[in-house]
Amino acid sequence: MKKFEYTPPEQPRELILKLGQKITDRIGHTVTAEDPEYYGLEALVTDEMAEVALKMKVRKPMTLAQIVKATGKEEKVLEELLQEMSNIGLLEYNWENPKHEKQYVLPMYVPGSAEFFNMKLDQIKEHPEVASFFERMAFLPLQKVTPMAVSYTHLTLPTIA
């Protein structure tokens, strides 16, 4: 497995910065290319995927027809892209509506895409930054809400025999 070492790009991808900011739940934080919100998304998300995701609201289900309307993209092309976005873990989908129509959801990071990015071992091996992304997004949002949570992440608990 490749070791994760990250150097922020000199020219960050603007769409990835915007998407990272849209999804983050870190209170009062502006996402930069040095943040896990950036490097986690940047590893797997294309600019085209980011454009589509930016037309969605976090945790608000949308049908294919609604996303077609929001993006102006051709239905068949968009459906394939949404499937790819779901396969990498950026989106989730369900049929939890009265018509049982497939709907896509842009989740928050944890629980959500930070976890989904780590569900395929080959994806983690190819992009080890997603493991760091998940670990960081499990704790960073809590810093301003519950400062003690971050310090507890490094405790070693005794083994109970």
Where are these regions (language model features)?
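N-terminal basic/disordered segments at the start of proteins
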Residues: 2-25
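Short acidic, hydrophobic short linear motifs in intrinsically disordered regions
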Residues: 59-70
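Hydrophobic residues on short alpha-helical segments
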Residues: 53-54
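Short alpha-helical segments that sit at the start of domains
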Residues: 25-50
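A short, conserved structural fragment
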Residues: 86-96
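Conserved small/polar residues in nucleotide/adenosyl-binding loops
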Residues: 153-159
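Short, amphipathic alpha-helical interaction segments positioned at domain boundaries
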Residues: 102-103, 108-137
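Short amphipathic alpha-helical interaction segments
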Residues: 73-84
